[in-house]
């Protein structure tokens, strides 16, 4: 799949962004080529991803509200590449053992 985003704002510049095989292949002005899809993005800002510094994943202890898997999948669907989970868990995330548990669970989700 190839995609060309035309006339978007990247930083302070208006330019095109070419994406091939889910990776940014080129950024520049007036990119030419045969693309599967072309999006006219006049006046829109292109960002690669977002970071959520205030995420309530609730695992361990409150998985019935949200867990690492469901919260991570929702974050990816919303364009977030990184989330930082709040310590409102049971037990509270206040030591390395709980942090290790969360990191291990995140690896299991494998996004």
Model-inferred region functions:
Residues 2-4, 9-48:
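Histidine-rich, glycine-flanked metal-binding segment
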Residues 12, 54, 87:
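Residues that line or immediately flank small-molecule/substrate-binding pockets and catalytic motifs
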Residues 25, 67-73:
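Short catalytic helix/loop segments, enriched in acidic residues and glycine
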Residues 35, 68, 92-94:
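Short secondary-structure boundary/hinge segments and terminal tails
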Residues 40, 52, 85:
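Redox-cofactor binding/interface segments in oxidoreductases and associated redox assembly factors
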Residues 43, 54, 75, 79:
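Conserved, mostly hydrophobic/aromatic
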Residues 44-69:
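Di-metal (Zn2+ and/or Mg2+/Mn2+) metal-binding site signature of metallo-dependent hydrolases
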Residues 73-111:
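Divalent-metal coordination cores built from histidine and acidic residues
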């Amino acid at each position: 799949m190839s995609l060309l985003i035309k006339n978007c704002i990247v930083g302070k510049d208006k330019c095109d962004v070419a994406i091939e095989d889910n990776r940014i292949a080129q950024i520049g002005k007036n990119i030419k080529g045969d693309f599967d899809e072309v999006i006219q993005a006049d006046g829109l800002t292109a960002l690669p991803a977002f970071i959520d510094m205030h995420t309530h994943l609730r695992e361990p202890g409150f998985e019935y509200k949200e867990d690492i898997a469901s919260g991570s999948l929702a974050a990816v669907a919303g364009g977030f590449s990184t989330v930082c989970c709040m310590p409102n868990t049971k037990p509270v995330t206040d030591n390395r053992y709980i942090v290790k548990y969360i990191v291990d669970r995140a690896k299991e989700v494998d996004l």
